[in-house]
Amino acid sequence: MNAAPSRPDTSRGAPKSPLREHVAQSVRRYLRDLDGSDADDVYEIVLREMEIPLFVEVLNHCEGNQSRAAAMLGIHRATLRKKLKEYGLT
């Protein structure tokens, strides 16, 4: 019996360009736009700029259910609640 050749999973509508590449492009653009200015908190900036829309979109997807959103994110609900409060999203 011949096995079917493996194919990329397109059942979920996988994006043509991986998320990682979008993030890399955004970071490159941000660093270029610094135009020689010093920045000593790029890590925190990137985390904040990624987490805020991530939390908003996952919560919307889960119809505001924080327990489901936390499970989908793979974090504890208390961590999600702490982050939402930290970002003023509550």
UniProtKB/Swiss-Prot annotation:
Coiled coil: none annotated. InterPro entries: Fis_DNA-bd (IPR005412), Homeodomain-like_sf (IPR009057), HTH_Fis (IPR002197), Trans_regulatory_Fis (IPR050207). One of its GO terms (molecular function) is sequence-specific DNA binding. Residues 1-22 are annotated as: Disordered. It comes from the Bacteria. Keywords: DNA-binding. Residues 66-85 bind DNA. This is Putative Fis-like DNA-binding protein. Belongs to the transcriptional regulatory Fis family. It comes from Xanthomonas axonopodis pv. citri (strain 306). The keyword DNA-binding applies. Pfam families: HTH_8. One of its GO terms (biological process) is regulation of DNA-templated transcription.
